[in-house]
UniProtKB/Swiss-Prot annotation:
Chaperone is among the record's keywords: yes
Family to which the UniProt record says this protein belongs: Belongs to the EcpB/EcpE family.
Organism from which the protein derives: Escherichia coli O18:K1:H7 (strain IHE3034 / ExPEC)
Protein's UniProt keywords contain Nuclease: no
SUPFAM superfamilies documented for this protein: PapD-like
Record's signal peptide: 1-20
Protein task: Part of the ecpRABCDE operon, which encodes the E.coli common pilus (ECP). ECP is found in both commensal and pathogenic strains and plays a dual role in early-stage biofilm development and host cell recognition.
Keywords tagged on the record: Chaperone, Fimbrium biogenesis, Signal
Gene: ecpB
Pfam families on file: EcpB_C (PF18649)
This protein's name: Probable fimbrial chaperone EcpB
Induction line: Negatively regulated by H-NS. Positively regulated by IHF and EcpR.
Listed InterPro entries: EcpB_C (IPR040695), Ig-like_fold (IPR013783), PapD-like_sf (IPR008962)
Amino acid sequence: MKKHLLPLALLFSGISPAQALDVGDISSFMNSDSSTLSKTIQNSTDSGRLINIRLERLSSPLDDGQVIAMDKPDELLLTPASLLLPAQASEVIRFFYKGPADEKERYYRIVWFDQALSDAQRDNANRSAVATASARIGTILVVAPRQANYHFQYANGSLTNTGNATLRILAYGPCLKAANGKECKENYYLMPGKSRRFTHVDTADNKGRVALWQGDKFIPVK
């Protein structure tokens, strides 16, 4: 993936087949002050790929999240939804949020269907071969509430998100355990209503630091 994400409070999932389609970050965020998002995908192989993209709304990005109905048919749009991607080429996929401007955070699964162009062009008699040569990749898009309320509580090395939008939280400084070295860093996503305790950084130390991101705004906590 293009951006390394440390263990997340959000348990996002996705599969990126080796030497195939690179869809970038497993998790993407559309901040409350934006209604568009662009993702660049890349075909790192030496053959063309047929890419089809589908959107699903989820009740939660966690493992127990279920597919649910969108509030309206054009709640989230994308373009292009289908494309032929030449070898070693890239393409920008754009997403447009047109849903309710309320206080609710929304979660979507972007499903990328990727298959070698030679397989896609086979006749129906050989369609059974397509499934084994194809890949289904799932990534997550989080759309922050249009009316975001950022609130949190911090005490004794634990952060609680008391607002209505996911926070990116981090801690860095002396390691809590000597076996982990001298300096440690932790980086998580924290959903509304969830708490997270830092377990690698000694946040009680004077040199231990805790901070978070509210959208694009950096907030020192300790």
